[in-house]
């Protein structure tokens, strides 16, 4: 039984790695009249929330701005998770819209792949193309093997129904490997990560 699960997870991981990753088109600045956060605002917010230097925060923000443009919202929060081939991640935070609206959000999700370890981290998620806070509540697939490191912070991209999330994580623990899974954003805390 364990051999079948390991074979299945291996197939899924290598299949995900061999296929072209789902990447949203590179976005420039948002169209005129559409609100978006400026890089200076976000560098300060990332630095304060994640407890990193302004230079480290600027490195991550500059790369995301160059690839995706200005976000319409962001989420500040914390999360924890662990895995041994099959894993789970749980988090909570606050969604901050450019127009001043804010809302409490929770997320959880399963993963499968070559993945072992546990971590706890603070998360700063840039949110693109979100006009209504209610639209964030859905599943966002992702391949954590697609993450990149900038100044000691891990960043990956998730996308669903035209909304793109770019979580920036900084924390403690070790979780090594590559996995595929999704994060499900909800209004209430959930304990079952499906």
PLM-predicted stretches and their roles:
Residues 18-20:
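Bacterial signal peptide processing site
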